[in-house]
Amino acid sequence: MIPAGTVQPWRPASRATYTVLFVCFLAILFEGYDVGVMGAVLPALADDRNWNLTPLELGALRSYALVGMFFGAFLIGTLSEMIGRRRMLLLCVSLFSLTMLGASYAPTPAIFGVLRFIGGLGLGGVIPVAAALTIEYSPPHRRSFNYGLMYSGYSVGILCAALIAMWLLPSLGWRGVIGLGAVPMVLIPLMAWMLPESLEYLVGQGRIAEAQALADRTGHGRLPSQARPANSAARAAWRDVMSSMFARKQLRATACFWIALFFGLLLVYGLNTWLPTIMRKNGYDLGSSLSFLVIFSLASAVGGLFLGGAADRMGARGTVALFYLIGALAIGALMFRNSVAVNYLLVALAGVGSVSASLILTGYLAGYYPAHARAAATGWALSFARFGAMSGPLVGGYVAGSGLSFGWNFITFSIAGLAAALAVALLPSAREPVVVTRGGQQSNAEIA
């Protein structure tokens, strides 16, 4: 964010906000399909006699993309502050779409894993860049809701993966369902035409005239001619980001964000990968076990909007902590012999208390740090959280292959949810230095 003393209030026009939301929604939807399809096809991969994979090997195969996402999040998040958020978002979608096509033809698990790792680089970069663009082009009083709306594309993508797998897996096999992940390549030209560049990036690079022209097209208000990058060395993004995250006054917040997202993504990726398999082990057939993934995804999508609105009204910190707790309790309750209807309800609460809570927490994080470090700080936090994402499928695979009852999977994931809730509850509140209200007035506001 450019210092208040040197910048006239600028507010995005509704058309610009919705355009950015739409493009970022598409990018996140495609990512959700890529991530969700592995869980949807996992039972078919387990039955593939050509590869004969063990449960632990299946979990490892699922984790290759997550390793790539670890590197992609902080590399691309930081690079986007140097070479442009718009360019990096389009590049990331192109990369993971192409590798999905390649993975569908992989002759061996090793080649499949390499392609998934490369695609993971693009997957890891989408979230921090889309988060930064969405927060930047949203009015402050709508940030959490808009972020929830944008990120609901992730759950819609997972839902599409589950529905497509239920419909086409018997006829196309797992290779055909994975190959459909290349479809986004067709929409890249449309996304490139619609998506504006980040004003924060342009100003941070000293491209003031270009930033002003874009500001005139996408919003209301002017950048004064004397505007300069907020930091004294516009291209010293690395030093600025490190200072923004690890200064003494920010250290506790950074630690809490990172720990909460670690356990949050352990939940998200562990449940996305193993929920159909665990429910199948509990006596459900393949179609019924996949239906739990559908419920999980639907609830996550709707829950993101609900939590976003609640966070805008009551504060993100308390809202996210509460729903992590609710999700943990719901996951733990799945270990009991419940009716199908009760299990559907519990899975829905688990979706809201894992995916929805994590996405609202990511949006809160993106607004917590200075604007010039928004994408990079989000990327660094998500990179650390990828250790949790990588652990989720492996933990589920270990428990599934250990001979323990299926209930131990739910106990393990429930503990992760409790840890995430505690970390969010320990987050310090922060004050945004300047918020532009609906009337265009500037005031201090606490981020709760």
What is the role of each PLM region?
Residues 1-33:
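Cytosolic juxtamembrane N-terminal segment immediately preceding the first transmembrane helix
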Residues 71-109:
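Conserved MFS/SLC helix-loop-helix module at the cytosolic interface between two early adjacent transmembrane helices
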Residues 170-181, 401-415:
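A membrane-interface helix-boundary motif in multi-pass transporters
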Residues 39, 248-304:
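Extracytoplasmic gate region of multi-pass secondary transporters
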Residues 84, 105-111, 139, 315, ...:
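Helix-breaking motifs and short loop linkers at transmembrane-helix boundaries and internal kinks
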